């Protein structure tokens, strides 16, 4: 009998604790909308952060709660947007396809060197000491953006500048974040004209440093003043939609080709 009392006591305590756990589970259980799992499984699982959340699962939770737009996943595009809208029973938002473009034409041949850089071969490291080019606004040529792209949508071209593979670009924005000189921007795929320069130096100085730099001559802004202005010694497109097709030839009279069509050869052919 002496041994039975401890056994009964332990059994009773085990039963009591078990009942307590069951009660706590039911009382403290957090309900999760099954749509979160449904949407999460359909997402690309890139976990790139382009949606503004920590990963695909976090985005799924946010979109189900109404905290994120159905079109918030740029990697998924229209297909994912439509799927999310159908799952939530709402109207799908319009998806504007965007592509990352480099605002620089400072190739090895065009942009003059100011010295030899022997440090760590990254743009961020080179940027800390001003880079090895005379232009302090141009591309540093070390390819941080290429290494940051999770979709193999960038490669370093023979001229020393990163080249975008349009069919692979998802507008995730990783290249935008990777560039220490903010040379990448996400533009609607339909936008054909951009400014291929970010230099804010005075025209004469810019031209000496890089023959493809904007010299703020004003040809483009005079051709289309309602869409293009000159600010801080640099051409700036205020509204691409206001650029009429018949104005494009005038805009492209730019003496340094620092503004113009992205696909000029394709459009001419």
Where are these predicted regions, by residue range?
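Ferredoxin-type iron-sulfur electron-transfer modules and their immediate structural context
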Residues: 2-217, 221-223, 248-269
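Strongly charged, low-complexity linkers/loops
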Residues: 219, 229-234
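Surface-exposed, short loops/turns at beta-strand junctions within beta-sandwich domains
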Residues: 242-248
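A generic structural motif
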Residues: 161-165, 234-242
């Amino acid at each position: 009998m002496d041994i039975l009392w401890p056994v009964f006591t332990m059994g009773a305590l085990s039963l009591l604790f078990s009942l307590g756990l069951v009660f706590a589970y039911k009382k403290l259980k957090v309900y999760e909308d099954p749509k979160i799992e449904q949407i999460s499984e359909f997402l690309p699982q890139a976990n790139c952060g382009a949606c503004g959340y920590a990963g695909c699962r976090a985005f799924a939770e946010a979109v189900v709660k109404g905290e994120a737009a159905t079109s918030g996943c740029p990697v998924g595009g229209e297909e994912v947007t439509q799927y999310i809208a159908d799952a939530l029973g709402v109207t799908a938002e319009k998806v504007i396809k965007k592509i990352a473009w480099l605002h620089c034409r400072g190739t090895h041949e065009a942009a003059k060197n100011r010295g030899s850089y022997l440090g760590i071969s990254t743009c961020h490291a080179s940027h800390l000491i001003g880079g090895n080019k005379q232009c302090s606004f141009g591309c540093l040529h070390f390819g941080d953006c290429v290494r940051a792209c999770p979709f193999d949508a960038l490669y370093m071209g023979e001229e020393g500048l990163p080249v975008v593979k349009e069919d692979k670009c998802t507008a995730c924005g990783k290249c935008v974040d990777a560039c220490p000189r903010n040379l990448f921007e996400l533009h609607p795929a339909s936008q054909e004209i951009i400014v291929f320069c970010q230099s804010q130096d005075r025209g004469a100085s810019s031209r000496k440093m890089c023959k493809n730099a904007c010299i703020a001559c004003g040809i483009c802004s005079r051709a289309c003043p309602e869409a293009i202005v000159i600010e801080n010694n640099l051409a700036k497109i205020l509204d691409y939609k206001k650029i009429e097709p018949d104005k494009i030839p005038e805009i492209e009279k730019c003496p340094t080709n620092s503004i113009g069509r992205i696909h000029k050869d394709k459009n001419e052919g």
